[in-house]
Amino acid sequence: MTTNNLIDIALHIPTPDAALTVAYSPIRLNLAGRQPLELRLTAPASGHKLPIVILSHGYGPSNYLPSKDGYAPLAQFWAERGFAVIQPTHASSRVGGLPAETEGAPFFWRERVEEVRAILDRLIEVEGQAPAVAGRLDHGSIAAVGHSLGGHTVSLLLGARLHGEVSGDSRISAGILLTAPGRGGKDLTDENEARFPFFDLDFAHLVTPSLVVCGADDNPRFTSRGPEWHADAYHDGPGARALLTLHGVGHGLGGIAGLDAKETEVEVPDGLEATKRMTLAWLRTILGYDAAAWTSACAALAGPASTLGQVEEKSSG
C-alpha cells in the first residue's frame, strides 16, 4: 500500500515514490527427484535492467506465510521502487514444501541453498514464465535477502561455511540478513545445539557486501544470549559492512512476514516502515543505483527518526 495513516516518524527516512508493479505466481521450475520449485515474481511494470532480489522466507509458526506468498510488506515495497523480487516456496514450507518424511526434514537447510542456486541457474526460464518481465532483468545485479532461517540460507550463499563446506555463490553481489541466526555450537543451549547442528556457521568467509538487521527486542530462544546473538554475522563476517538495529521490534521486525500476522510479536507500523525504507536504501546504494540513498537514510535515522533505530558501520579502511 502507498497511503499509510499508521506511520509517522519513519516518514523522515527518504524513499522513492511507488510505481505500478506486476506479479506472476506460480512460476514453476522442475527439479530432479522432487516436486517443482514454485516461485512468485513481483517486478516494476516498466523499466529495463531491473536489479534482482531473491527473498528467502523463514520457518515461522504460520502455515502459509513461510512460502512464496508471504513477506508482501517487503516484496511489494521493493518492487514498487525498482526491484524484481523472486520468492521461492522453500522445501521447509508447511504449505508447499517437501514431504515430512524426506531426508533433511523439517528444515532442509541444504535443499534451501540449492533452491536459490537453481533460481540463479535458470533465471532465463523464470523470465520466460513472466511475459511482461521477460528480457527486463539485470542478471548481473543480484541481491539475496533472508529472514530468520532464510538468513541462515543467505548467510551460506554469501560465503559463510559449515565445517569448511563451501556454499557461497559469486553471482550474488550483495545480501541482507534479517534477524538471522548467530553463532551455533556452544553459543546455543544444549538442547538447541543438538537440534540445530547446522547453525554452527563460520562467518569469517562471509565476504559478500552485506547488511545485518536486528530487532532490539528480539528474544532468541536458541541461545542464553540476548538479541545481540542475531548480530554475530556483522561482527564475524568481513563482508558484513553495516548493522541496523531497530528499536521497539522483535524477530518479526514490526511485521515483515505479513500484516496482522502471528509471526510478529508486536506490530509496529513505524518499525516496519523503517525496515522497508532502510533495506531499500541499502540495496539501491550497494547495487549501484543511487550512491546517496544509504547515506541519506542513515542521516535521517541518526536525526529526526532516531527513536526508530541506529546504524553501526565498519570503517572502509
Predicted feature locations:
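Short amphipathic alpha-helix adjacent to the substrate-entry channel of hydrolases
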Residues: L65-P88
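Alpha/beta-hydrolase-fold serine-hydrolase catalytic core, especially in secreted/extracellular enzymes
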Residues: G248-G250, I256-G317
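Short glycine-enriched nucleophile-adjacent loop
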Residues: I124, G151-E165
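Alpha/beta-hydrolase active-site loop
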Residues: G104-H139
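Short beta-strand element of the alpha/beta-hydrolase
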Residues: K49-G58
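Conserved alpha/beta-hydrolase "nucleophile elbow" surrounding the catalytic nucleophile
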Residues: H57, G146-H152
